[in-house]
């Protein structure tokens, strides 16, 4: 799980950013997983390349098949003045990420104008993926990008 999160974060840092400046809200951000059960990355502004999205989608599909953990990634240029943590929490609830009754969803949010990467786990994942591990993944990836 940690290696998958590290790969996703590294992808965010290594692929060129091609953002259009649009402010996204929880209401206007498309939930791509509803349209295609094998698509986990919401990248409406095209910030990540299609190859990066395909790679992340493939990894997250395998993760869900092996563990039942549903993970979605949202990559947007801006959420306005909204707080990343609150936005991520709202996405988890609005999109219904995770299995009902298990609350085992994970939302990973990248907001380029705020230089923010945020994890939000459902209650059912807090034992498997506590905040300390999420923070460790962020720090590890940030350190690798600085080198």
Q: Over which residues does each language-model region extend?
A:
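A short, hydrophobic C-terminal helix/tail in secreted or cell-surface proteins
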Residues: 143-147
